[in-house]
Amino acid sequence: MNNQKGLSVKSVVAIGIGAAIYVILARFTSIPTGIPNTNIEIVYPFLALLATIYGPVVGFSVGFIGHALSDFLMYGQTWWSWVLATAVLGLIIGLYGMRLDLENGVFTTKQMIGFNIVQIIANVVSWLIIAPVGDILIYSEPQNKVFLQGATATITNSISILILGTILLKAYAATKVKKGSLRRD
């Protein structure tokens, strides 16, 4: 009987390595949008991959730790409302990822569509609700500014995950042996 409590070693390692890679990707792959402090982020497809493979706790943790560290290293301060939004994005995608069977090489067109519906909803919750409302409540930022940033982030992050995230998940599933695909000769 396994009464193990807490995170597995595999999850802890995924969080540590994932957060480190998050910081590197956030630092070197951000593409400015022209909206202040809002970029096209290549890091979110990576977060979606980790959250889908390892689950909601890893997705939340990598998003939270990675975003907090990258904000601090790049700007000298951390925008906690956006850190929480990133963590929630990882959490929601990770919850949906539990329904997928990537480990057995399965990522069907129907699952791709479901994944993308969920990630778009997660982006809306994160960037159109959590981040701007947090900016208003915590930092007293102007509403029109933060909702413009949130709308831009929602669109760019949704597209980024739709394209790159789907490709990463399909490629990951393709590396796994499909259940029942091996036959004895």
From Swiss-Prot:
GO CC terms of this entry: plasma membrane
NCBIfam families in the record: PRK13661.1
Protein name (record): UPF0397 protein LJ_1703
Major place of residence: membrane
This protein's UniProt keywords: Cell membrane, Membrane, Transmembrane, Transmembrane helix
KW tRNA processing (keyword) present: no
InterPro entries according to UniProt: ECF_substrate-spec-like, UPF0397
Source organism per UniProt: Lactobacillus johnsonii (strain CNCM I-12250 / La1 / NCC 533)
Protein family membership: Belongs to the UPF0397 family.
Membrane topology type: Multi-pass membrane protein
Transmembrane portions of the chain: 6-26, 46-66, 78-98, 113-133, 147-167
UniProt keyword annotation of Nucleotide-binding present: no
Cell location: Cell membrane
Family annotation (Pfam families): ECF-ribofla_trS
